[in-house]
Amino acid sequence: MIGCLSLARETFDIKFANNKLVKTKNIIKKLNRNFIFFEDLITNDDIGKNALKFFEKNKCTKFIVLQSTFTDAKFISSFVKKFKKPILFISFKERRAGGRLRLNSLCGVNLALHSLVKNKFYSNFIIYSNNEENLSKELLRFINISHTLPKKNYLKKTSISKKTSKKIVSFKKPNLGIIGERPEGFDTCDFNNK
């Protein structure tokens, strides 16, 4: 069985996120596979706890996570530590309209993947841009993968051009520090002074 869940924050356009969620669920259901959905948008700790209990009762071999809006990585980090199963994230492409993004789901996926990679858990994501055929193809590829967890990150390394290696700003006595602790779920803000 493959578990499906959706992450969101109420500070974003929840109505728009729910519309994307319904469309994506319908595409997933058309694949005629053994899927089980946690129906509620996971928007807070209490709903997150309910999702954990739901998937404890409904054993899954893989998970599809719909990153409906931006979220921090708090829930998904604890979810992965608990279940340790392959995950495919789906983010939603949205047009820039000159202001704040309505969903900003790709940024949520980026934060989640960074947190997971720091904990040596490698995953993948796809961006759904209203092309049902491509989404179905990518979902089937994930479903049919024979191995359980990727052993490495598949992001390509890029080289820095020599033209950009010159100093842009020169500091006489540079200092870097951190005041307080990072917010929970924002592992990208970790600081190591060694």
What is each of the regions a protein language model found here?
Residues M1-K194:
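An N-terminal assembly and electron-transfer interface module characteristic of large anaerobic redox
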